[in-house]
UniProtKB/Swiss-Prot annotation:
Reaction equation(s) it catalyzes: RNA(n) + a ribonucleoside 5'-triphosphate = RNA(n+1) + diphosphate
GO cellular component: a single term: DNA-directed RNA polymerase complex
Family to which this protein belongs: Belongs to the RNA polymerase beta' chain family.
Coiled-coil intervals, chain numbering: none
Record-given protein name: DNA-directed RNA polymerase subunit beta'
Gene Ontology BP terms: DNA-templated transcription
Residues reported to bind Mg(2+): 460, 462, 464
Annotated InterPro entries: DNA-dir_RpoC_beta_prime, DNA-dir_RpoC_beta_prime_bact, RNA_pol_asu, RNA_pol_N, RNA_pol_Rpb1_1, RNA_pol_Rpb1_3, RNA_pol_Rpb1_3_sf, RNA_pol_Rpb1_4
Keywords noted in UniProt: DNA-directed RNA polymerase, Magnesium, Metal-binding, Nucleotidyltransferase, Transcription, Transferase, Zinc
Ligand binding (Zn(2+) 2): 814, 888, 895, 898
Length: 1403
């Protein structure tokens, strides 16, 4: 018996390991793994079904087919364990060794491993410094290669085709050595002196200036050094021995009818063995060279197919014409080993069923069908039955359960009590997609789900299914209850707002309840308290909507007992008074005394959570839900066709619009406007008309005239069902009602362009055939979009998770004072997101001072909560420096201070929180709501583009930023700067709005002036770009030759003439080099200079400029010399929605990007080249930078103008890499955060900036070496920042030169693949490439991230698993250095000292 126990113990001995290394296997190693050579291609004997000896399933090599039984049947039973049968040679042991024991094939001729040959960049060709094409020619026997030239003039590595080879042999005899095939390559690799080569390359790199050469040498040097350091030998990339996979991993399964289903690998192995055996025979027979060569080539091809089918040439196909699945295919892709079996597994103790609504449940409950519960909790029930003495053995308990007697149900109730279960709805897009509930047993077969958690699960009851999982161990139950319980997940981790908010029916009920009705029964009554109101309502003395007055008592919980009570009389309605009964003490009555729309209810829950905590909020939310459902039922709201009221004014509005359109068509016919303009204007008119109709309709729907008690006519909000549903936020929107009762409006074609004939009908009136046909366009595109969108969104989420998965909070505080400045977010002049919302939950990096003094208002390192941001607002501060994940200085991970508040919990983040994954989920989860559409500037969009003035919305003072102004003779100010801004600041010094001031704008107010609301402070011509003079003087036109460089044009309408500069392309050769320019001279004719400089006032004019001054005319400061017409007709696609977010995170270069100034300095134009203009910036220190810009791009700057580094010279979308290089990390952060937020904001999705910053932080993980110093890195190499910093510290300790570096921005896909962990990268994408690279360099995976640990089957180093990992490391250190045991206990920063021994063991 003890023997048996020992045997069982042996089986589950798990090795502790800290890291995983991958490398190349040497032939000896492969032979050591093997239990015998596979010599025959046979698999099993089809008569006896026994494996053939020496075949692919041989029992002698791989082990017995049945447990403890040899093949011939001489030895059976456990007692013969370990005996090797002398008859059939099979060891008597467990059959599962057939999953572990490998075999091998001795190849008759060496074969190149296709991964190292064809996976780009080809390692073999890089190492030998030959082209891949050449190496392939050698390998596949098309040419010979010179291995050792001896004394001949041939060179090592030179290729000789057949004729050349014969000729060389004739000439030199056997002086030289040249071969073909894998032997040749192997010999070359063997004879390569790696160390010498490395030294030579290092010298060459320092000795050359050519960038391409440095790049090439560096690549090779890196590979060579990797081989030297890793202990891999280069000749191991050529296989002499081929390992054979254990047979149970490539099974052969008998089907009915005597056929077999087999793994494709068996076919591939059979081909290899067949060819190998044939080659051996041919070599033994000394067959002619050409036959042997052909056989060798075929062997090479069959090994290629086994390792990676289809990588070279045509893929080998099976009987069904599909390519066979090779070893490489087994591990890559969605169905490969990584993603199918290691990252996602099927789990026991789980079930799934359809969900139905459970409106009577409490928030922490879910209804579990009895049948399901019985099945899921079976082992628990068996145990309980046995302990209770109701069954003697497990078998008896099983019988009891199968009978389903009454005692079983009693036991089930006990087992389930307080044992949480986890519910999950696929797709699990964020962490709220799995939550824990306490099960309540119910009849029926459907799971009941609490309505308030539907938002988090994104569940509806139209046939959705959910899965149930049972946490088994005590720790699992504890975590489920403490961390995953639905009552603990009230806030959304994406934005920190409540996600447990009533929707749909509940909102409708509460809204209906809190409406007012004029002249309702009981209006004007006075009540002593709310109970009296309830009695009046229940006895039908007062209606729900009657306006009444009632005395209420409010309690302030912050005051001591008995002091916080206040009583007052309030005007309200019966419904609102009844609603206020639910308000927990401490919430003012004001919060409920209004129309409860969805927004208001959400606010109410939020305030409740912030003021009164979790428990109160949960109870309150539940009670709100019950009341909402009840009132929605009582209200009897439903939709009828008569609720859709078409406004009477509609016909008149449409007639007006048609009139306007006709007018424009006439203008077009007479040639006054272009086709593009006509189209834009028509679209404009119709979108405007649509708005007007919608407005008229909403007025009709939303208000009605009624008589009040005195008989006067008053307006009140209607009780129209459709309007109430939309207004409350329960269902539908104004846009949908507009289609029902207004007009459908303009439709888009599938390519996104707008059809200019609108649909004037609505659904209530019905569409005619043409209108219906136009509608189908958009509808069909919508459906196609949705399908694509889901897939794209899922892929984006996957990339985001992959790039951020290893980012965990590992420290309390890294102690940095760096951070990023946060200002209110402004769009179109409006403050869209005030400062308080942006800094809430962040930690201050620097002290905040009271404005105008040096008194510290809020000290640094304060976590800004609601009360602090309120204080910030009263101070009127408009910019704050806060800590950010991007500036965090923690080596591995991020510190809690740089992250700030845990949005899903509302307090400072815990150590061990997996913020990377949370960030990825928060950005990816709303992805499906984003549109896929790319908008053309047309319709509604074009109206916002052509602004021509700044109109102030708030009263306040003007502050100008970087604006250069000249004063015109008329007293007006004219802006002559490009990136100027005007801010409007109120009395408290808070910024209310801000606007960009374009070049050439006329300002009517100066810095510090006070302006009123609605005042216009700046105007400009929207469609032209002026050239403005900054000095007064006389005009000289230079190089103006009418008919060659300029032409005179007369305006038909006004009759005035003007000069237009011609495009150099259209000029004759003689005048091509001339550059028309306006010079300003004084009376004597000498050049005037710009104020305060010695730069002459020369204004070069680009092609297309219209000159508005004549030669010798006098001009004053601020006058317009010329105008450049802006091309507004070009419709640029604005990429919107999901593709835009993906582009930003992938850091892609946009089309026609902005050109930024590389250095600060003065602009001048150099000699033009074909199609390009040369722009030169000269710095103050004489540094020059040249930029070639295509002629058709419009340059923003003029000759002699000063530009700052990073300023845009040519407009366009900026390249993120340029922003990083020229303006730094902080500017890049602003750019990406704002651009991403803009997309989400359009869809009304709120995401905290922190999440985007976390992803940017991961995109900036790598740095590029500029100067390697004394480190072993190479110039231009990309290194992980922590690794570089460690190396630099080492250098500084040894008084050597550290490396200089600059940050690089990688797109998320690149960043994921460039991660230090090869396991994580391989499981993401491009598995073959990643594994090839890792094997050659002998990479070691430290298993730091989450993904790697999931793959090796451990707890993840985040959350509660962090303690387990640090404990494991600590024990490890104790084993390694027992003498320093006492000193070592307090070193780790995870605080693992609190974790007991048992805790670590069980976790």
């Amino acid at each position: 018996m003890r023997d048996l126990l020992n045997l069982l113990k042996q089986q589950n001995q798990v090795e502790e390991f800290d890291s995983i290394r991958i490398g190349l296997a040497s032939p000896d190693m492969i032979r050591a793994w093997s239990y015998g050579e596979v010599k025959k291609p046979e698999t099993i004997n089809y008569r006896t079904f026994k494996p053939e000896r020496d075949g692919l399933f041989c029992a002698k090599i791989f082990g017995p087919v049945k447990d403890y039984e040899c093949l011939c049947g001489k030895y059976k039973r456990l007692k013969h364990r370990g005996v090797i049968c002398e008859k059939c040679g099979v060891e008597v042991t467990l059959a599962k060794v057939r999953r572990e024991r490998m075999g091998h094939i001795e190849l008759a001729s060496p074969v190149a491993h296709i991964w190292f040959l064809k996976s780009l960049p080809s390692r073999i060709s890089l190492l030998l410094d030959m082209t891949l094409r050449d190496i392939e020619r050698v390998l596949y026997f098309e040419a010979s290669v010179v291995i050792d030239p001896g004394m001949t003039p041939l060179e090592r590595g030179q290729l000789l085709a057949d004729e050349a080879y014969l000729q060389a042999i004739e000439e030199y005899g056997d002086e030289f050595d040249a071969r073909m095939g894998a032997e040749a390559v192997q010999k070359m690799l063997k004879t390569l002196d790696l160390k010498g080569e490395a030294i030579r390359l290092r010298e060459e790199i320092t000795g050359t200036n050519s960038d391409t050469k440095i790049k090439k040498f560096s690549k090779r040097l890196k590979l060579i050094e990797a081989f030297i350091d890793s202990g891999n030998r280069s000749e191991w990339m050529i296989l002499e021995v081929l390992p054979v996979l254990p047979p149970d991993l490539r099974p052969l399964v008998p089907l009915e009818g005597g056929r077999f289903a087999t793994s494709d690998l068996n076919d591939l192995y059979r081909r290899v063995i067949n060819r190998n055996n044939r080659l051996k025979r041919l070599l033994d027979l000394n067959a002619p060279d050409i036959i042997v060569r052909n056989e060798k080539r075929m062997l090479q091809e069959s090994v290629d197919a086994l390792l990676d089918n289809g990588r070279r040439g045509r893929a080998i196909t099976g009987t069904n014409k599909l390519p066979l699945k090779s070893l490489a295919d087994m591990i890559k892709g969605k169905q490969g080993r990584f993603r199918q079996n290691l990252l996602g597994k099927r789990v026991d103790y789980s079930g799934r069923s359809v969900i139905v609504v459970g409106p009577t449940l409490k928030l922490h409950q879910c209804g579990l069908p009895k049948k399901m519960a019985l099945e899921l909790f079976k082992p628990f029930i068996f145990g309980k039955l046995e302990r209770a003495g109701l069954a003697t053995t497990i078998k008896a308990a099983k019988k009891l359960v199968e009978r389903e007697g009454p005692e079983v149900w009693d036991v089930l109730e006990e087992v389930i009590r307080e044992h949480p279960v986890m519910l999950n709805r696929a797709p699990t897009l964020h962490r709220l997609g799995i939550q824990a509930f306490e099960p309540v047993l119910i009849e029926g077969k459907a799971i009941q789900l609490h309505p308030l958690v539907c938002v988090a699960f994104n569940a509806d009851f139209d046939g959705d299914q959910m899965a149930v999982h049972v946490p088994l161990s005590l720790e699992a139950q504890l975590e489920a209850r403490a961390l995953m319980m639905s009552t603990n997940n009230i806030l959304s981790p994406a934005n920190g707002e409540p996600i447990i908010v009533p929707t749909q029916d509940v909102v409708l009920g509460l809204y209906y309840m809190t409406c007012e009705r004029v002249n309702a029964k009981g209006e004007g009554m006075l009540f002593a308290d709310i109970n009296e109101v309830r009695r009046a309502y229940e006895t039908s003395i007062a209606e729900l909507h009657a306006k009444i007055s009632v005395r209420i008592t409010e309690i302030d919980p912050s005051k001591p007992e008995g002091e916080g009570e206040t009583t007052r009389l309030v005007n309200t309605t019966v419904g609102r008074a009844l609603l206020s009964e639910l308000l927990p003490p401490g919430l003012p009555f004001e919060l409920a005394n209004k129309n409860m729309t969805k927004k208001e209810i959400s606010r109410l829950v939020n305030i409740c959570y912030r003021r009164l905590g979790l428990k109160t909020s949960v109870v309150f939310a539940d009670r709100l839900m019950y009341l909402g459902f009840r009132q929605a039922t009582l209200s009897g709201i439903s939709i009828g066709v008569n609720d859709m009221v078409v406004p009477k004014e509609k016909q008149a509005i449409l007639a007006d619009a048609e009139e306007e359109v006709k007018e424009i068509e006439d203008q077009y016919a007479s040639g006054l406007v272009t086709n593009g303009e006509r189209y834009n204007k028509v679209v404009d008119i119709w979108s405007h008309t649509n708005d007007q109709v919608a407005k008229a309709m909403m007025e009709r729907l939303g208000s009605e005239e009624v008589y009040d008690a005195k008989g006067n006519v008053v307006k009140q909000q209607t009780f129209n069902s459709i309007y109430m549903m939309a207004d409350s936020g329960a269902r539908g929107s104004a846009a949908q009602i507009r289609q029902l009762a207004g007009m459908r409006g303009l439709m888009a074609k599938p390519d996104g362009s707008i059809i200019e004939t609108p649909i004037t009908a609505n659904f209530r009136e019905g569409l005619d055939v043409l209108q219906y046909f136009i509608s189908t366009h958009g509808a069909r595109k919508g459906l196609a979009d949705t399908a694509l969108k889901t897939a794209n969104s899922g892929y984006l989420t996957r990339r985001l998770v992959d790039v951020a998965q290893d980012l965990v909070v590992t420290k309390d505080d890294c102690g940095t004072t760096r951070g990023i400045n946060i200002t209110p977010f402004v769009e179109g002049g409006d403050v869209v997101e005030p400062l308080r919302e942006r800094v809430l939950g962040r930690v201050l990096a620097l002290n905040v001072y009271v404005p105008g003094s040096n008194e510290v208002a809020i000290p640094a390192s304060t976590l800004l909560d609601e009360s602090w941001v309120d204080y910030l607002e009263t101070l009127g501060i408009d910019a704050v420096k806060v800590r950010s994940p991007i500036t965090c200085e923690t080596r591995y991970g991020i510190c809690a201070a740089c992250y700030g508040r845990d949005l899903g919990r509302g307090y400072r983040i815990n150590i061990g929180e997996a913020i990377g994954v949370i960030a990825a989920q928060s950005i990816g989860e709303p992805g499906t709501q984003l549109t896929m559409r790319t908008f053309h500037i047309g319709g509604a969009a074009s109206r916002t583009v052509t602004t021509d003035r700044i109109e102030v919305k708030y009263k306040g003072n003007i502050r100008l930023h970087n604006v250069k102004i000249v004063q015109h003779d008329s007293g007006k100010y004219v802006a002559v700067s490009r990136s100027g801004e005007v801010h409007i600041v109120d009395e408290q010094g808070r910024e209310r709005e801000r606007y960009k001031i374009p070049y050439g704008a006329e300002l009517s107010a100066g810095d510090g002036d006070t302006v009123e609301s609605g005042q216009v402070i700046a105007t400009w011509a929207p469609h032209t770009h002026p050239v403005i003079t900054e000095v007064a003087g006389k005009v000289r036109l230079q190089d103006f030759l009418e008919g060659s460089t300029v032409e005179r044009q007369a305006d038909e309408v006004t009759g005035l003439t003007s000069l237009t500069v011609l495009d150099p392309k259209q000029r004759g050769a003689a005048v091509k080099e001339l550059r028309p320019m306006v010079k300003l001279v004084d009376e004597t004719g000498s050049d005037l200079c710009l104020a305060g400089t010695d730069i002459p006032a020369h204004y070069y004019l680009p092609a297309g400029a219209v000159v508005s001054v004549e030669d010798e005319a006098m001009v004053g400061v601020g006058d317009v010399l010329a105008r450049l017409p802006q091309e507004s007709s070009k419709t640029r696609d604005i990429t919107g929605g999901l593709p835009r977010v993906a582009d930003l995170f992938e850091a892609r270069k946009p089309k026609d990007p902005a050109v930024l100034a590389e250095i600060s300095g003065t602009v001048s134009f150099g000699k033009e080249t074909k199609g390009k203009q040369r722009l030169i910036i000269t710095g103050s220190d004489g540094e020059r930078h040249e930029e070639l810009i295509p002629k058709w791009r419009q340059v923003n700057v003029f000759e002699g103008e000063h530009v700052e580094k990073g300023e845009a010279i040519v407009d366009g979308p900026p390249v993120p890499h340029d922003i990083l290089r020229l303006r730094g990390v902080e500017e890049l952060t602003y750019y990406i955060v704002n651009e991403v937020q803009e997309v989400y904001r359009l869809q009304g999705v709120k995401i905290n900036d922190k999440h985007i910053e976390v992803i940017i932080c991961q995109m900036l993980r790598k740095v590029e070496i500029i100067e390697p110093g004394d480190t072993s890195f190479l110039k231009g190499e990309q290194i992980d920042k922590p690794r570089l910093l460690e190396e630099n510290e080492k250098m500084e300790k040894e008084d050597k030169l550290p490396a200089r570096f600059e940050p690089v921005l990688l797109g998320i896909t690149k960043a994921s693949l460039a991660t230090e962990s090869f396991i994580s990268a391989a499981s993401f994408q491009e598995t073959t490439r990643v594994l090839t690279e890792a094997a050659v360099t002998g990479k070691c995976d430290e298993l730091r991230g989450l993904k790697e640990n999931v793959i090796v089957g451990r707890l993840i180093p985040a959350g509660t698993g962090l303690a387990y990992h640090s404990e494991r490391r600590r024990k490890r250190r104790m084993l390694e250095q027992p003498e320093s045991l006492t000193a070592d206990t307090g070193t780790s920063h995870y605080g693992e000292d609190e974790i007991s021994e048992s805790g670590a063991a069980t976790a």
